[in-house]
């Protein structure tokens, strides 16, 4: 991948504020995977091992309630990320993520990212700062929904 292709990923919340070459370095730690409609990429209740950035496609975030009925919580598309909470929490996945259409994903190993953090990789630290901003934004949105 060259710099102009990296710039496409600059709108990914985890990569906010990173330079194209830093985004390229992070993408170098990932692998591209392709999934077909109906593929369960993340299973509710499973231990987190990877997180993903959607290069192209549409996936649903689905929660199963007490009577085993699936409820779509969100629909994700190009340049959205999911599974990233596994970087900061060992909690099992709170929802499933299922492909709605054929999709291309960038798959990042959580273990590899943690190794890089242990090695004090500056770019990965900056990505985790992006994760902190994303979590803060989600909490703010959740609070606004409760109040409004």
Features from the language model and the residues they span:
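Cytosolic regulatory regions built on CNB/CRP/Popeye-like sensor folds
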Residues: 1-148
